[in-house]
């Protein structure tokens, strides 16, 4: 069997195309040859090459399954990520609708002030110029508007829970 090793190694390399994989295949082949008796009416060389080829086919199939399993796991992870992203979009849409509904329940002055500062991004000074009220009034309207929206959203969440 020792004299077959160089030929088996070349054959394994021709199957795998890689020296490291060829050496692994050669080792598996030799282990299998040593663990099973030689069948009757078969030459050692023919048997050794057949075992090497069968080991390569087994490894090829196993790699294919591993690659498919990795692709499936990757797809499931991406799918889960996609579902998580979709859940996030839905949650944001529901939250936006709740906030919009809560803003509609605010008194006109508070809704205008909150819209200018929180939605439009104006500073307190800019909002006070637009609404022609003191800066302190803007701050107090914002505080009351935020408190009312917070209470409305908390009560809606309690109903949903």
Would you name each region that the model predicts?
Residues 1-10, 14, 20-23, 39, ...:
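A short, charge-rich alpha-helical start-of-domain segment used by transcription regulators
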Residues 8, 12, 22-33, 127, ...:
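Short, small-hydrophobic-rich alpha-helical interface motif
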Residues 18, 123, 132-137:
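Helix-turn-helix DNA-binding motif, specifically the short coil turn and the N-cap/start of the second
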Residues 27-44, 62-63:
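Sigma70-family region 2
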Residues 68, 125, 129-132, 146-161:
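C-terminal edge and immediately downstream basic/flexible tail or linker adjoining helix-turn-helix-like DNA-binding
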Residues 76-104:
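Acidic, proline/glycine-rich intrinsically disordered inter-domain spacer in sigma factors
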């Amino acid at each position: 069997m020792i004299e077959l090793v160089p030929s088996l190694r070349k054959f394994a390399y021709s199957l795998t195309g890689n020296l490291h994989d060829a050496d692994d295949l050669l080792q598996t082949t030799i282990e299998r040859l040593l663990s099973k008796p030689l069948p009757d009416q078969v030459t050692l060389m023919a048997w050794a090459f057949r075992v090497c080829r069968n080991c390569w086919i087994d490894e090829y199939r196993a790699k294919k399954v591993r690659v498919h399993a990795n692709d499936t796991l990757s797809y499931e992870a991406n799918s889960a990520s996609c579902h998580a992203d979709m859940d996030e979009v839905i949650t944001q849409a529901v939250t936006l609708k709740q906030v919009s509904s809560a803003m509609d329940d605010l008194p006109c002055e508070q809704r205008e002030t909150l819209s200018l500062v929180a939605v439009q991004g104006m500073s307190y000074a800019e909002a006070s110029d637009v609404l022609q009220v003191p800066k302190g009034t803007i701050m107090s309207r914002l505080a009351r508007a935020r408190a009312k929206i917070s209470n409305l959203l908390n009560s809606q969440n309690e109903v949903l829970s």
